[in-house]
């Protein structure tokens, strides 16, 4: 049995099936990160003392700018597809992938610094929350990179077979990527600045 891929909007939702699916998935992700942020708030409010200044603010700020830049390159990748410019699309998608990799390398050095000083997740409640939230966020970055690698590599063949379908998949990947970036926009001030 072959289920046809449709790019038309459904009359009952006003969205194509793929877009509805990604929005439902992102809603579940909002609940996941919302629960973790709520836990953070409860633990922080109930704590007698809360550590401040344990994180490298400059590295966190650099990562913020890296992810914002990656959001821009992801939009440019999708917009290039809409303008039928395959070469620019590929360039922007590769740039997004590279920026995500730079973000993860920065996180690696940040984690290594903490762990070398014996400051692992069991060191304090703050660091347990920090490693949980940023680790889960990092896994989402890796997930996005896997999807991008697929579209840079073997999945790129779809462009020649069905350009609309390929552009839709890049759009849905972009929605996911913007969500991942938005999560970091919340994580940075909560963990690094407050």
Language model features with spans:
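...captures the hydrophobic TM-helix bundle architecture rather than a specific catalytic motif
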Residues: 1-194
């Amino acid at each position: 049995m072959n289920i046809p891929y449709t790019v038309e909007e459904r009359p009952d939702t006003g969205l194509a099936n793929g877009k509805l699916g990604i929005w439902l998935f992102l809603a579940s992700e909002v609940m996941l990160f919302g629960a973790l942020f709520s836990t953070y708030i409860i633990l922080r409010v109930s704590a007698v003392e809360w550590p401040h200044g344990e994180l490298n603010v400059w590295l966190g700020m650099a990562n913020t700018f890296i992810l914002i830049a990656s959001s821009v390159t992801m939009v440019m990748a999708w917009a290039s597809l809409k303008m039928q410019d395959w070469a620019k699309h590929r360039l922007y998608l590769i740039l997004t992938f590279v920026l995500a990799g730079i973000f993860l390398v920065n996180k690696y050095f940040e984690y290594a610094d903490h762990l070398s000083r014996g400051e692992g997740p069991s060191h304090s409640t703050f660091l347990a929350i920090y490693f949980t939230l940023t680790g889960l966020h990092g896994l989402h970055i890796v997930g996005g990179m896997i999807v991008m690698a697929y579209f840079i590599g073997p999945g790129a063949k779809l462009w020649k077979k069905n350009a609309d379908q390929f552009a839709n998949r890049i759009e849905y990947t972009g929605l996911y990527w913007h969500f991942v970036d938005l999560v970091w926009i919340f994580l940075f001030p909560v963990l690094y600045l407050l």
